[in-house]
């Protein structure tokens, strides 16, 4: 086929020749043939590139339009990639007054087989959340990168970088898989070229670059491949709402409205209810959506169509590049909600079996449920977001285990029972993300006042109730931040054994306490049991109102019945099973899934003190 020359972007020519030397950025870095959406928009950044004419030569490709940014250093090229376009490399020639001033080679890759069928995490999975800088240091050579603004490692300061990296995660995939996890969620590993607190990853300064202190893009790809080989899905932690204040474009924005409130720092009021509140003032809505999350985190204006396209394509690029098993979206609800619909629906159109979870930190299920796909909202708002983090249930679980049992029908285990009863407000409760803690709140062991038994009770609940369980690294060894409430750096402490100089190694068991070993062993047993019992992922729930510090619920399908008994009492109890006849009728035996002991369920069931007992009913 003869190549057809296509010349576009005949922009207003200047009166003098450009002093044009190079293209600084072309994003996305590459693209693929065979995508469902044939459109691709390239962001081109380089000195005076807006005054050039872009010329390409490639078969089966057309250009819809080109748009110059308000800064003359940006050009946006909209391409249409036909279904029959072949993978390959083509030149983008940038011309001025008939002369080519720069040529950039761009690549169209062939998609991985069945990439469009990528499956996201689901209720059959158990997710291990980890902070890469604090998990394991597998490559000491990248601890300090002199080109970066934060140049030191200091494990004695909880706000500094400690040296964990992608190699450290790869090195311990066997541990993660052996524990029974089937998905990992590392906090962001993209470039965070900030002077301070760059370890956490949420001040991104380049959406298309892995932070070199974590490793390279090849390392990230290796992690994805090796995790998949071990049955572990990789979840990408993304931030659409804001960037870091040292982002490469900050001193020369493509458009004047690329950021919200760009001229002075105004903090978000964090009033997330304005998205649903029919009485909310325009002032409060503006402060919520357009205020900055923090003074080093500029708020991106996703109502700008070029930025919106940029962010959507960025998500797709990472899904396709790493063959991801899911996206976790930070600060969901802070961005423009029309954009959030466009973003979520664009991703799901390209990957219909994918999963994305949004962080909506509200304890009100009426607020959290608003964002989930399938929800019939009064204001007509529609979303394609599959999964929501279940903050209401997290809070109810901790309160239930800490509060005294009594006559108040909304306290203690009764509060947990009623929290689950709120599931009628969710479009798809089985796809809620359930958790006891995460990297932004006090550790579960701390929240439960360092009570080992209550911690085990919480873990058993999370692994047997509806939803997709997410556990935080170190929970298995009772890591805590007691005495340092909401100290983020301490909450995200180093995992013992992740550094070669560590005297304690929780990966091998060297030096761990008896309590730590007990919980680690207990959790490993539960996780691996759950992985092999699909009734927990897909089965129905039947629960009975708590009484006398005891809460009983069942997970069941046609093939199997699981009985869960939460006994919060400080003494063992015997439970009369007659109350549960509607589900236990005709069943006589069960097995304690932790101890393996047989149990008769014809009369009474004995349950130890402060225990969540799980029985497989025969």
What kind of feature is each model-predicted range?
Residues 130, 176, 186, 207, ...:
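Conserved, mostly hydrophobic/aromatic
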Residues 58-65:
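Short, solvent-exposed loop/linker segments at beta-strand-coil boundaries, enriched for Pro/Gly
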Residues 70-118:
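Extended acidic/polar, glycine-enriched regions
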Residues 1-28:
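Bacterial Sec-dependent N-terminal signal peptides
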Residues 100-102, 109-126, 177, 477-618:
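Carbohydrate-interacting/catalytic domains
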């Amino acid at each position: 086929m003869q190549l057809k020359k296509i010349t576009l972007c005949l922009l207003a020519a200047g009166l003098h020749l450009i002093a044009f030397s190079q293209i600084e950025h072309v994003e996305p870095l590459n693209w693929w043939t065979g995508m469902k959406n044939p459109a691709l928009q390239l962001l081109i950044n380089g000195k005076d590139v807006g005054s050039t004419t872009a010329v390409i030569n490639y078969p089966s490709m057309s250009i819809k339009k080109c748009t110059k940014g308000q800064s003359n250093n940006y050009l946006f090229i909209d391409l249409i990639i036909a279904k029959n376009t072949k993978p390959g490399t083509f030149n983008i020639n940038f011309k001025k007054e008939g002369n080519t001033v720069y040529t950039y080679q761009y690549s169209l890759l062939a998609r991985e087989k069945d990439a469009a069928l990528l499956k996201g995490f689901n209720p059959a999975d158990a997710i291990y959340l980890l902070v890469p800088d604090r998990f394991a240091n597998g490559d000491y050579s990248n601890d300090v990168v002199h080109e970066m603004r934060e140049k030191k490692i200091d494990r004695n300061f909880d706000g500094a970088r400690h040296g964990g990296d992608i190699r450290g995660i790869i090195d311990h995939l066997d541990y993660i898989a052996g524990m029974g996890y089937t998905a990992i969620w590392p906090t962001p590993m993209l470039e965070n070229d900030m002077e301070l607190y760059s370890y956490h990853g949420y001040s991104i300064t380049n959406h298309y670059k892995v932070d070199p202190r974590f490793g390279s893009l090849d390392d990230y790809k290796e992690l994805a491949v090796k995790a998949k080989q071990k049955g572990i899905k990789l979840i990408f932690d993304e931030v659409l709402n804001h960037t870091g204040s040292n982002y490469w474009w900050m001193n020369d924005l493509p458009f004047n409205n690329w950021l919200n409130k760009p001229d002075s720092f105004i903090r978000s009021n964090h009033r997330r209810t304005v998205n649903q509140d029919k009485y909310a003032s325009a002032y409060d809505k503006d402060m919520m959506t357009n205020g900055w999350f923090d003074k080093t985190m500029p708020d991106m204006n996703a109502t700008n169509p070029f930025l919106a396209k940029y962010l959507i394509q960025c998500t797709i690029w990472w899904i396709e590049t790493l063959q991801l098993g899911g996206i976790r979206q930070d600060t969901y609800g802070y961005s423009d909600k029309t954009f959030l619909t466009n973003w979520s629906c664009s991703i799901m159109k390209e990957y219909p079996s994918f999963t994305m979870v949004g962080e909506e930190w509200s304890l009100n299920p009426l607020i959290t449920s608003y964002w989930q796909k399938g929800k019939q909202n009064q204001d007509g708002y529609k979303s394609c977001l599959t999964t929501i983090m279940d903050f209401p249930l997290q809070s109810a679980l901790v309160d239930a285990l800490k509060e005294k049992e009594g006559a108040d029908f909304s306290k203690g285990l009764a509060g947990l029972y009623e929290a689950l009863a709120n599931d009628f407000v969710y479009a798809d409760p089985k796809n809620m993300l359930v958790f006891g803690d995460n990297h932004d709140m006090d550790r579960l062991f701390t929240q439960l006042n360092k009570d080992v038994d209550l911690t085990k009770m919480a873990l058993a609940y999370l692994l047997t109730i509806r939803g997709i369980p997410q556990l935080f690294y170190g929970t298995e060894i009772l890591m805590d931040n007691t005495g340092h409430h909401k100290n983020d750096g301490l909450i995200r402490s180093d995992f013992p054994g992740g550094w070669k100089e560590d005297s304690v190694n929780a990966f091998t068991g060297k030096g761990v306490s008896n309590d730590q070993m007990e919980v680690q062993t207990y959790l490993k047993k539960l996780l691996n049991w759950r992985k092999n019992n699909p009734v927990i992922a897909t089965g129905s729930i039947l629960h009975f109102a708590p009484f006398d510090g005891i809460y009983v619920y069942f997970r069941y399908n046609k093939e199997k019945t699981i009985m869960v008994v939460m006994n919060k009492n400080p003494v063992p109890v015997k439970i009369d099973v007659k109350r549960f006849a509607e589900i236990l009728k005709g069943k006589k035996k069960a097995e304690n899934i932790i101890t393996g002991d047989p149990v008769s369920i014809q009369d009474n069931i004995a349950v130890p003190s402060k225990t969540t007992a799980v029985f497989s009913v025969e």
